[in-house]
C-alpha cells in the first residue's frame, strides 16, 4: 500500500472528514515520525511496533560496475520492529 492508497482508504472510511484533511493528517504524522527519528528518539506504537535507528558500522563495499573496493562510512539507518499483535496477525498468512 502506498501513501496515497492509505489516504484514499482512510478518506473512504471517514466520509465525514474531507479527503484533504485526511491527507494533511497522514503527511503530518509521517513528518513527525521522521523528525523524531532524525533527532535520535525512538517511536513506539503499542500493538503495531517500534521505529528506531540502528548503527551500521563502516565497511568495505564494492562498486558493482567496476568491482573496485570502496570504503563505506558508518551511518544510522531506520529500523522497524513489529509488535507481537502485528506479528500474530501477519502469521495468519504465513
Curated annotation (Swiss-Prot):
Superkingdom of source: Bacteria
Example of a GO cellular component annotation carried by this entry: cytosol
Gene Ontology terms describing biological process: DNA recombination; regulation of DNA-templated transcription; regulation of translation
Xref: Pfam families: Bac_DNA_binding
Family as reported in the entry's similarity comment: Belongs to the bacterial histone-like protein family.
Role of this protein: This protein is one of the two subunits of integration host factor, a specific DNA-binding protein that functions in genetic recombination as well as in transcriptional and translational control.
Name used for this protein in its record: Integration host factor subunit beta
Amino acid at each position: 500500500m502506498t501513501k496515497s492508497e492509505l489516504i484514499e482508504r482512510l478518506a473512504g472510511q471517514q466520509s465525514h472528514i474531507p479527503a484533504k484533511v485526511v491527507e494533511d493528517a497522514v503527511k503530518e504524522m509521517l513528518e513527525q515520525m521522521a523528525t523524531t527519528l532524525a533527532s535520535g528518539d525512538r517511536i513506539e506504537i503499542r500493538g503495531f511496533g517500534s521505529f528506531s535507528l540502528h548503527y551500521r558500522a563502516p565497511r568495505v563495499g564494492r562498486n558493482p560496475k567496476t568491482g573496485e573496493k570502496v570504503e563505506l562510512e558508518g551511518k544510522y539507518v531506520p529500523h522497524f520492529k513489529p509488535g507481537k499483535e502485528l506479528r500474530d496477525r501477519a502469521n495468519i498468512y504465513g
